[in-house]
């Protein structure tokens, strides 16, 4: 799969487990992101990254977003992908995806066909 296609399945946008402001986190530019994928109870993929590897810090993203736009409260940034499974990898119905971010929590979703 071409990477943008792998991130934007039809009818899908997992966000969570909670919304936080960057000011509520000690250092939003140094958070560990971990991804684990389980199939039939077995770990089949695991990787981690950090927000420190982002091309722009959150303050810079906010500055550019608000430069020419009115931005309502609870606006959410959807940024790039720091964790990339191998090209031959694909999620299957029933797979369990866990994504954890330091100071935020763990989002856990099971893959379903819609």
Q: What is the meaning of each model-derived region?
A:
Residues 1-114:
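Catalytic-pocket segment enriched in acidic/His residues
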């Amino acid at each position: 799969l071409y990477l943008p296609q792998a991130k934007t399945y039809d009818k899908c946008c997992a966000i969570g487990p909670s919304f936080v402001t960057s000011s509520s986190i000690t250092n939003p530019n140094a958070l560990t992101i971990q991804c684990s994928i389980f199939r039939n109870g077995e770990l089949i993929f695991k990787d981690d990254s950090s927000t420190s590897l982002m091309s722009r810090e959150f303050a810079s993203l906010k500055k550019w977003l608000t430069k020419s736009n009115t931005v309502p409260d609870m606006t959410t940034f959807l940024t790039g992908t720091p964790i990339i499974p191998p090209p031959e990898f694909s999620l299957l119905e029933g797979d369990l995806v866990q994504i954890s971010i330091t100071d935020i929590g763990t989002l856990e979703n099971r893959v379903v066909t819609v």
